[in-house]
Amino acid sequence: MDRVLSRADKERLLELLKLPRQLWGDFGRMQQAYKQQSLLLHPDKGGSHALMQELNSLWGTFKTEVYNLRMNLGGTGFQGSPPRTAERGTEESGHSPLHDDYWSFSYGSKYFTREWNDFFRKWDPSYQSPPKTAESSEQPDLFCYEEPLLSPNPSSPTDTPAHTAGRRRNPCVAEPDDSISPDPPRTPVSRKRPRPAGATGGGGGGVHANGGSVFGHPTGGTSTPAHPPPYHSQGGSESMGGSDSSGFAEGSFRSDPRCESENESYSQSCSQSSFNATPPKKAREDPAPSDFPSSLTGYLSHAIYSNKTFPAFLVYSTKEKCKQLYDTIGKFRPEFKCLVHYEEGGMLFFLTMTKHRVSAVKNYCSKLCRSFLMCKAVTKPMECYQVVTAAPFQLITENKPGLHQFEFTDEPEEQKAVDWIMVADFALENNLDDPLLIMGYYLDFAKEVPSCIKCSKEETRLQIHWKNHRKHAENADLFLNCKAQKTICQQAAASLASRRLKLVECTRSQLLKERLQQSLLRLKELGSSDALLYLAGVAWYQCLLEDFPQTLFKMLKLLTENVPKRRNILFRGPVNSGKTGLAAALISLLGGKSLNINCPADKLAFELGVAQDQFVVCFEDVKGQIALNKQLQPGMGVANLDNLRTTWNGSVKVNLEKKHSNKRSQLFPPCVCTMNEYLLPQTVWARFHMVLDFTCKPHLAQSLEKCEFLQRERIIQSGDTLALLLIWNFTSDVFDPDIQGLVKEVRDQFASECSYSLFCDILCNVQEGDDPLKDICDIAEYTVY
């Protein structure tokens, strides 16, 4: 190997292969390293073209030189010194070379016997070699020839070329290796065939120990016959050459009659060279089924690419394998299992207490089953069991006597849940649109009713609590332990849907009637002291404007009829003249929102979106650019109103939008506008149908200051005060027939608490700037609302 390459080339090749020097000559590792470095140095893989070219050149030279070296060892390598016996002579070694320098290492030779006897004596000194028989002593040295004999008709030595004559392999002479040959390797055409039953002796490969062929050929050459004799030979004695010394019985290559009967048609149709091939297998008479029986389709899961787990499975295979799986399925700890036969196959149905994937069960069964195997999960175990235990299926065995329906059903437990509808009705009845407020009420309802302090007092400001506590106590207990409290309250607070539906289905007169009815019901529940307090507010309003009851009636008519350009109302006057209090009372009575129109123009869109589904809106404290009173601050409110004339005019629908919601097209509701002494442009002035000029009245301000409860309880800003003013000054015929009875009842109630003369005394106290209830009711009796 040191002469294969020069020292420099050898070191360069090892460097390119990245191998240490001690691995030089290890062809296997060098070839593996060459393949790895080829992947790294190939130009298409990002390597160096020059290094790849150098590696290919050195490797090609190395392979060529190694090939030539091995070829040159054929006649000179071991002539003078046979392996492991170079020091001993020919007679001492127990074997002698033949004419082609071959030293016999084959089974049964003298050298083979001596070597193994020496080996056994090392371990057992008393070992004695078996006695030699006469036959074995005279038997020539045998050699097992392992290369194929490819001659189709070797009976005639003249038909076999000289280079294809049989030869013996010399283990002392290196043979050419195709793996390192520069030429492409030849495709092997040899096939292994069984050794004939009549062959005897150690060779059995078709060559005599003396170099002769079993077919009578001389074996002086080094080549083998091109083709072996046909397996089904008819002329056994002729082909065998009639030699008894070869160790083969005459006719040993004759075919078996059973093989002839099975392959008769095949042997007649095939060529002479095809007898070396394995005969084709016969087709199965009963092919494996492709799916479960159709009667089980409705009870099985047909999901293929799913990781879902199941507790019940059905395995379909052969009867023998199903019986084996029935005994070994204990890995999954089945609670129930049964073995069923169906036609030529079997089925294993089992249930487990834990869930498993179908792939896990199938993979386990496939380790024990080489025949067809199908496994699916059972979605309806009880129904599937009833089918597989009836005809045409046959139940073989089961680990317990059957399945029953009660094993799959539990007794229904009454699991009460929170009534979402009840919570939504509670919010709708009490006009609650704040989710947190609804949650607070319901958590408060979870307390015990008998020990509730709020219910025992029955205060007016707590009437929502003590009126609904007992009704919602049971549902509140479930709500207390519910995980979806916020979701329930958010849905209940979404009263916008019912309000929008009401706006579509009801007229504005009906909506006004409903609002008045709600106010009258609240007034009906007031006590005597609270009734006098609200009558004081009525007296204060009657002193605010001249003929105030008629003015209020006209305002309600304008806002209810909602005629374009005949619906908007303007309250204008100096500071502290009662504009804001009256506007707030109207919003409370009719239901609406107050808007800030003085904001920048880019924020007006969301501010106006608050007006969705409202009966009326109030533009509070609008500021203008030109003030009649120089002490007033200018603002952009009037300019914004001028730019939004089409919006609040009420002629066409406009798009109103809120945050996190889409725009909605609707008519903008009528508005009540309050402002100080600002100059209005003609375009804005034309949109107001009623203009009320307020003036400062010191006696009204003094009356409010002296009656603390009118301000603290916001009696002036309450819509119930305006509703009481209407029923106090108008007959019941003015109201809707549906609420005339309630109007009369509430009026009689207040008339019993306060006579007309007493009301006149209250009115006089207001006009004089005193406490409205002076000398009429003790202030300590007032109930805080």
Swiss-Prot record:
Enzyme superclass (EC): isomerase
Q: Which residues carry this modification: Phosphothreonine?
A: 278
The UniProt record lists the SF3 helicase domain at 547-707
Sorted alphabetically, the Gene Ontology BP terms of this entry are: DNA replication; symbiont-mediated perturbation of host cell cycle G1/S transition checkpoint; symbiont-mediated suppression of host innate immune response; symbiont-mediated suppression of host JAK-STAT cascade via inhibition of JAK1 activity; symbiont-mediated suppression of host type I interferon-mediated signaling pathway
Ranges of compositional bias, category Basic and acidic residues? 85-97
Q: Where does ATP bind?
A: 573-580
The note on the cofactor says: DNA helicase activity requires Mg(2+).
Describe, by residue range, where the zinc fingers (T-ag D1-type) fall in the chain: 415-508
The cellular component terms of Gene Ontology attached to this UniProt record, alphabetical and capped at eight, are:
host cell nucleus
Q: Where is the composition biased (Low complexity)?
A: 148-161, 233-247, 264-274
Coiled-coil positions are none
Motif Nuclear localization signal covers: 279-286
- Which residues, as ranges, make up the DNA-binding region of this protein? 293-406
Q: Which residues bind Zn(2+)?
A: 452, 455, 465, 469
Q: Which GO terms describe its molecular function?
A: ATP binding; ATP hydrolysis activity; DNA replication origin binding; helicase activity; zinc ion binding
Post-translational modification remark = Phosphorylated on both serine and threonine residues. Small t antigen inhibits the dephosphorylation by the AC form of PP2A. O-Glycosylated near the C-terminal region.
Localization (cell): Host nucleus
- Keyword match Nucleotide-binding: yes
In this chain, the stretch annotated as Disordered covers: 74-97, 145-291
Keyword Metal-binding attached: yes
Start and end residues of each J domain: 12-75
> Where on the chain is N-acetylmethionine found, per UniProt?
1
Q: Give the Enzyme Commission number.
A: 5.6.2.4
Record motif LXCXE motif, residues: 142-146
Assembly with partners or alone: Forms homohexamers in the presence of ATP. Interacts with host HDAC1. Interacts (via LXCXE domain) with host RB1; the interaction induces the aberrant dissociation of RB1-E2F1 complex thereby disrupting RB1's activity. Interacts (via LXCXE domain) with host pRB-related proteins RBL1 and RBL2. Interacts (via C-terminus) with host TOP1 and POLA1 allowing DNA replication. Interacts with host preinitiation complex components TBP, TFIIA and TFIID to regulate transcription initiation.
Name of the protein in its database record: Large T antigen
Q: Organism, per UniProt?
A: Murine polyomavirus (strain A2)
